């Protein structure tokens, strides 16, 4: 299978590894990017593999409470300048109002606002996309927005200040699950197998590797779960420990960040300026 430049670029963006290393890894896996990442982690060639899902688009995250739930909406545009534009934000808030009224699906939101969107694109001169909407249920909800780029809503049993602080923690620390035991078994097994292989590649006997992996797996599930993470307000304690001290709990959370997973075209600024200068001379 011929390896394309696009595949090499994607792997390079996701791992931070060199171009030739990426091409070699893809060749060895017959173009399987996920397997290539695993193999590069084993060999130590992809120390930045966690870069997957970096922000690659502009726009805004908005939040509004409904009856017993909250709606989180992402609307995208092409530049940070337009993301702050009053017309763009008014459009995004109009979509949010409808979403928060009755948990409207993203497909229905897109259809309902398509004409308005097209008119705004013509007016502003940038592509605009109503990308996604998420809903979280709960009688006790707290929200936090970091500017308009990150939005978090946390559901749980706690006082307002505690839940707000937890929402701020989620914004900063990006947990994927509420508790370590919520991490899916297949993800745990995949990581465990990977860690055993890494340990054995370091020259450790199988029985020693197994024991080492127990600690590594506890760290792995803790780092990607909210209650297992070190609390940003009190780094010596986990979020779970702090919640327990307060007699509080978190049942769910949603975190959205502008542009997650969107491939953004890389601009050559120098070439762009040169082209503009050439155009003025023409």
Curated annotation (Swiss-Prot):
Region (Involved in Mg(2+) ion dislocation from EF-Tu): 79-82
Principal localisation: cytoplasm
The UniProt record lists the keyword Acetylation: no
A single GO cellular-component term on record: cytoplasm
GO molecular function: translation elongation factor activity
Entries under SUPFAM superfamilies matching the protein: Elongation factor Ts (EF-Ts), dimerisation domain (SSF54713), UBA-like (SSF46934)
Subcellular location: Cytoplasm
Keywords for the protein's UniProt record, in alphabetical order: Cytoplasm, Elongation factor, Protein biosynthesis
Pfam families per UniProt: EF_TS
InterPro entries assigned: EF-Ts_dimer_sf (IPR036402), Transl_elong_EFTs/EF1B (IPR001816), Transl_elong_EFTs/EF1B_dimer (IPR014039), Transl_elong_Ts_CS (IPR018101), UBA-like_sf (IPR009060)
Family to which the UniProt record says this protein belongs: Belongs to the EF-Ts family.
The protein's role, per its UniProt record: Associates with the EF-Tu.GDP complex and induces the exchange of GDP to GTP. It remains bound to the aminoacyl-tRNA.EF-Tu.GTP complex up to the GTP hydrolysis stage on the ribosome.
Protein name, UniProt field: Elongation factor Ts
């Amino acid at each position: 299978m011929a390896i394309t430049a696009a595949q090499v670029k994607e792997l390079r963006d996701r791992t931070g590894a060199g171009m030739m290393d990426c091409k070699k890894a893809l060749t060895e896996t017959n173009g399987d990017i996920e397997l290539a990442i695993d193999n590069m982690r084993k060999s130590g060639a992809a120390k930045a593999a966690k870069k997957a899902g970096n922000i690659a688009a502009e726009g805004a995250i908005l939040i509004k409470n409904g009856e017993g739930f909250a709606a989180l909406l992402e609307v995208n545009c092409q530049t940070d300048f337009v993301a702050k534009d009053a017309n763009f934000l008014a459009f995004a808030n109009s979509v949010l109002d409808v979403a928060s009224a009755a948990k409207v699906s993203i497909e229905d939101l897109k259809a309902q606002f398509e004409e308005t969107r097209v008119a705004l694109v013509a007016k502003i001169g940038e592509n605009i996309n109503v990308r996604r909407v998420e809903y979280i249920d709960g009688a006790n909800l707290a929200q936090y927005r970091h500017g308009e780029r990150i939005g978090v809503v946390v559901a749980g049993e706690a006082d307002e200040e505690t839940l707000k602080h937890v929402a701020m923690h989620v914004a900063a620390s990006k947990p994927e699950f509420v508790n370590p035991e919520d991490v899916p078994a297949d993800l745990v097994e995949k990581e465990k197998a990977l860690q055993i292989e890494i340990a054995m590649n370091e020259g450790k006997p199988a029985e020693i590797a197994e024991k080492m992996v127990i600690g590594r797996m506890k760290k792995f599930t803790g780092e990607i779960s909210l209650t297992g993470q070190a609390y940003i307000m009190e780094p010596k304690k986990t979020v779970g420990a702090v919640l327990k001290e307060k007699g509080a709990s978190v049942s769910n959370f949603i975190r959205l960040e502008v542009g997650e997973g969107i491939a953004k075209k890389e601009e050559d600024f120098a070439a762009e300026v040169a082209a503009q200068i050439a155009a003025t001379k023409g």
